[in-house]
């Protein structure tokens, strides 16, 4: 299998290249907090020599409760993203939830993300494909790794083959997720070598069966991330917050911002080691 290279500007993304970090905050809470978090990520990744793409959502359209914070919206969100790009020179990834958002978002950011819950919505896939932007497809919790090839095919039929796939866990009974480490390789093969990344933040979610917000297991983020990166992946997706207990979305799964550097030191060491090994085919 040949590993496909997808380029985000001058950043190459491939399963056999040094990993790319997709990281930032779950949702834009304020302009000032976005600047603070982005600056910290930029400082740490530059120090460690890790290619970096900033992540945040401008609208969390799939919150469990109608009363939950969703974000600043499209117009204000794009203004914040433009300022981040101008200030720090970063590439940016964000998600879209409606077809009409695809082009306005693609005009500002570098990667547009197809949310897991919407990954089989053909109208949205077609609208995103038409932008020509790099696409990050989240694997739905209810879809097997091998079925991701069908979603990739939709994008290719729509004229866009610049696809990254992202695993964020699979349903395990009610209100729980697990990550199948063998599934990463299945996704690579099902998509003809497309880059595969791991969203360790959302894989740590666990729900209160009667509550209106997701719980999480941030205390296990290092172990799960290390396990995933040992497979050999194109990138890692992780969200951080300076005060996870008071984050407006998914705080229980967020990495404390002050732990980012030591965390990434471990991840980079594993990635460097794994990708120094020659490929070993044990299928025959």
Curated annotation (Swiss-Prot):
SUPFAM superfamilies: Aldolase (SSF51569). GO terms for cellular component: cytoplasm. Pathway: Carbohydrate biosynthesis; 3-deoxy-D-manno-octulosonate biosynthesis; 3-deoxy-D-manno-octulosonate from D-ribulose 5-phosphate: step 2/3; Bacterial outer membrane biogenesis; lipopolysaccharide biosynthesis. The keyword Cytoplasm applies. GO terms for molecular function: 3-deoxy-8-phosphooctulonate synthase activity. It holds the Pfam family DAHP_synth_1. Disulfide bonds: none annotated. It is an enzyme of class 2 (transferase). It is found in: Cytoplasm. It catalyses: D-arabinose 5-phosphate + phosphoenolpyruvate + H2O = 3-deoxy-alpha-D-manno-2-octulosonate-8-phosphate + phosphate. Keywords: Cytoplasm, Lipopolysaccharide biosynthesis, Transferase. InterPro entries: Aldolase_TIM, DAHP1/KDSA, KDO8P_synthase. Its EC number is 2.5.1.55. GO terms for biological process: keto-3-deoxy-D-manno-octulosonic acid biosynthetic process. Belongs to the KdsA family. This is 2-dehydro-3-deoxyphosphooctonate aldolase. It comes from Pectobacterium atrosepticum (strain SCRI 1043 / ATCC BAA-672) (Erwinia carotovora subsp. atroseptica). The gene is kdsA.
